[in-house]
Amino acid sequence: MKMFTVISYDIVDDQRRTSVMKVLKGYGVRVQYSVFEAILDAREFHDLSNQLRKIIDPGQDSIRCYRLDQVAAQRTVIYGIGLTTTDPTHYMV
């Protein structure tokens, strides 16, 4: 089952931060400077997690992933500009 996933990151090193951003762009939509939204099934989330863990320095960097079911995702509130990600915009082949 696909789940609405919010991924935020705080990466110290510019090169690692750029690498993380490029990986995330392949899975979802950037909604803020260090925040992405994606709709991922368990396999996609597992693959994404593995890629991100290979990039970061766990002693310096932080990535947080919030997996929301459909009910929780529908309670998302946005103030200001922007839309909630509702459909997958990237497909893995």
From Swiss-Prot:
It holds the Pfam family CRISPR_Cas2. GO terms for molecular function: metal ion binding; RNA endonuclease activity. It is an enzyme of class 3 (hydrolase). Its cofactor is Mg(2+). Mg(2+) binds at residue 10. GO terms for biological process: defense response to virus; maintenance of CRISPR repeat elements. Keywords: Antiviral defense, Endonuclease, Hydrolase, Magnesium, Metal-binding, Nuclease. Its EC number is 3.1.-.-. HAMAP family: Cas2. Belongs to the CRISPR-associated endoribonuclease Cas2 protein family. Homodimer, forms a heterotetramer with a Cas1 homodimer. CRISPR (clustered regularly interspaced short palindromic repeat), is an adaptive immune system that provides protection against mobile genetic elements (viruses, transposable elements and conjugative plasmids). CRISPR clusters contain sequences complementary to antecedent mobile elements and target invading nucleic acids. CRISPR clusters are transcribed and processed into CRISPR RNA (crRNA). Functions as a ssRNA-specific endoribonuclease. Involved in the integration of spacer DNA into the CRISPR cassette. PANTHER family: CRISPR-ASSOCIATED ENDORIBONUCLEASE CAS2 (PTHR34405), CRISPR-ASSOCIATED ENDORIBONUCLEASE CAS2 3 (PTHR34405:SF3). This is CRISPR-associated endoribonuclease Cas2 3. The lineage of its organism: Bacteria, Bacillati, Chloroflexota, Chloroflexia, Chloroflexales. The gene is cas2-3.
